[in-house]
Curated annotation (Swiss-Prot):
UniProt KW Calcium keyword: no
Protein name: Cobyric acid synthase
Residue span, GATase cobBQ-type domain: 254-442
PANTHER family tied to this protein: COBYRIC ACID SYNTHASE, DETHIOBIOTIN SYNTHETASE
Pfam family, any one: CbiA
Role of this protein: Catalyzes amidations at positions B, D, E, and G on adenosylcobyrinic A,C-diamide. NH(2) groups are provided by glutamine, and one molecule of ATP is hydrogenolyzed for each amidation.
Gene3D superfamilies xrefs: 3.40.50.880, P-loop containing nucleotide triphosphate hydrolases
GO molecular function: ABC-type vitamin B12 transporter activity; catalytic activity
Active site per UniProt: C336, H434
Organism in which the protein naturally occurs: Anoxybacillus flavithermus (strain DSM 21510 / WK1)
Pathway: Cofactor biosynthesis; adenosylcobalamin biosynthesis
GO annotation terms (biological process): cobalamin biosynthetic process
UniProt family annotation: Belongs to the CobB/CobQ family. CobQ subfamily.
Amino acid sequence: MRRALPIMFQGTHSDAGKSMLATAFCRIFARNGWKTAPFKSQNMSLNSYVTLDGKEIGRAQGVQAEAAGVVATTHMNPILIKPSRDQEAQIVVHGKPYENMKASTYRNEFFHLGLELIQQSLHVLMNEYDRLVIEGAGSPAEVNLNDRELVNMRVARMANAPVVLVGDIERGGVFASLVGTLQLLEEQDRKRVIGVIINKFRGDLSLLEPGLRWFEQYTGVKVLGVVPYMHVRIDAEDSVALSRYATKKDDAKAIDVAVIRYPRISNFTDIDPFFAEPDCSVRFVSDASSLGEPDILILPGSKNTIEDVYFLTETGLFSSIQRLYERTNVTMIGICGGYQMLGECIKDPFHVETPLDAVAGLSLLPIETTLACEKTTVLSEGTLVYKNEMFDVKGYEIHMGRSIVKQGEPLILLSGKTDGCKTKDERVIGTYMHDLFHNDMFRHHLLNGVRRKKQLSPLMERPNYRQLRAQAFDDLADCVEKHVDVKAIERKMIEFQRGEHHAL
């Protein structure tokens, strides 16, 4: 019977680079001929991925499955937590909404069910794959939470997985973070840590080497590698990553793409393809004073559309967006929650998001939205009609609500139905389809249309985003193989399987 060899990546904090390293190892193992699966027992994220059977998992595990060349399933992320408001989140179990819970309720009442779900998924994956790349969350040294944690050392024990601890040197204090984390671990868990990887390094490695030697002597734990800072086009999962994005226009780029950053922004990976375009400056906007006059304004998805509409009002963005449409030639695009905001009204008769019955939208699209208790999660494809051209597009939908188009024209023709809406002048468009901009032909047409409006020649050579993503997986794997002792990690994986737990 097949029995997967597991390896687990844990970090000193969120956004240390666990997801990226897990993705790299999924690619490395797959390239070496091993059938490989990613696993994250519990993921807290507003960036989702829809599986082939219409289930919802964390974006990172979907991307890691792509890197491994396997079909993503809910066993790769059996529990997904989607924050919807302060101290409350939607709990998604095996890709379907389970219940909205307060943080305290989840901790006190979900623990035993969570353990059972995790054990079941581990059993399935361990018996179907050769390698299992497990990702932790946050830090394993959260001493106030460890008695009922479901995602770090408890999972390592359940899978009998060796652990690699990841530290982010870019933030500073990496040795303090690594040493402090190791010291706060229980002795049995500390023995699982086979080494550390220092991530996001910039500069002269020789200046770091005395610190590496000191760390190994002080802790007895091996430094398995120092990974340089990498600019890779692979989806960010954690909203912490948003802090790295620009808030000001790059004047060297011809097209100014502004993205509204509201508190409950979700699936912001929708805009990733614009970062690959040579003439696009992408910036995030969170107040009226920084809106300016962009060429393209994107209202992305939201986990709580009504609360984020109030955010637009409180920050002055609501009226500024309306004035922007009236006074400029901007193209506005709403995706999912952003599409709902562009409409006339968002009704919430079942109080899915807030105690309010309804809220007024921006009234830039002739639609009305009614939120519902049942969530739609589906892969979709169809024909998009825009500026007298037709484009085959595919993506996915994740939403709780339906939008009725009162007038105007649909944007996308699906099999037996339509999706989205556009104004007659096609300056405002909206859709429930995530990954819309991942469709190269439409994205290229949109951007070259903006160039023509600005009396600039269109660019005939633009990137194929899916090819770039595939290349990014290989570039990432190449970089990690160069800078990390992969063979030492594989040896420890085999030793743990045999029950040999001695030091490196």
